[in-house]
Amino acid sequence: MSETILVTGSSRGIGKAIALRLAQSGFDIVVHCRSRIEEAEEVAQSIRELGRQARVLQFDVSHRNETAEKLLADVESHGAYYGVVLNAGLTRDNAFPALTDEDWDVVLRTNLDGFYNVLHPIMMPMIRRRKAGRIVCITSVSGLIGNRGQVNYSASKAGIIGAAKALAVELAKRKITVNCVAPGLID
């Protein structure tokens, strides 16, 4: 039986590239999208053409209950995930004095709360597998050094980095690793 990896935000961009690369490496993939279902289905089809299994889950990672319901139903139907790539995220860039409450809230809810909302419901099923597992958080250089016009985004990514470090300590004895990848600007 092949191991399955959930890749959030994998209908396009970095997430799509990660999902395809993991499929090429022999993993089955759960393709996730918030709204781009057609693009997510195309990614899933590309994965199937590589000889791997793929399915699509659609939910907004900033909505805790919806995220938990979708993930728990998927785990119930298909079993616990071997790994998760937390890639879903967004930016709402603006100089801090011009940053709106909504700009702050939506970025923190999606990026930082999304970490909790995705991982919390699937953590015990991953632990109960009693096998090694992997969690990779796609963060940003902005979470390490900050970036002009991205106070909200930098705060969210720095929060993920801190949470990932703490979770890595918690899960180390269970052979589940937690790491962050912090890219710079992406084309």
Residue spans for each PLM region:
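Active-site loop immediately N-terminal to the catalytic Tyr-X3-Lys motif
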Residues: P97, I145-V151, K173-R174
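Conserved glycine-rich cofactor-binding loop
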Residues: S11-R12
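Substrate-binding pocket helix/loop in short-chain dehydrogenase/reductase
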Residues: A95-F96, T100-L108
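Active-site helix of classical SDR
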Residues: L119, S156, A164
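Alpha-helical segment proximal to the catalytic Tyr-Lys
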Residues: M124, V169-K173
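Conserved glycine-rich Rossmann-like NAD(P)H-binding loop of the short-chain dehydrogenase/reductase
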Residues: F27-E41
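Residue(s) in the substrate-gating loop at a strand-loop-helix junction
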Residues: S140
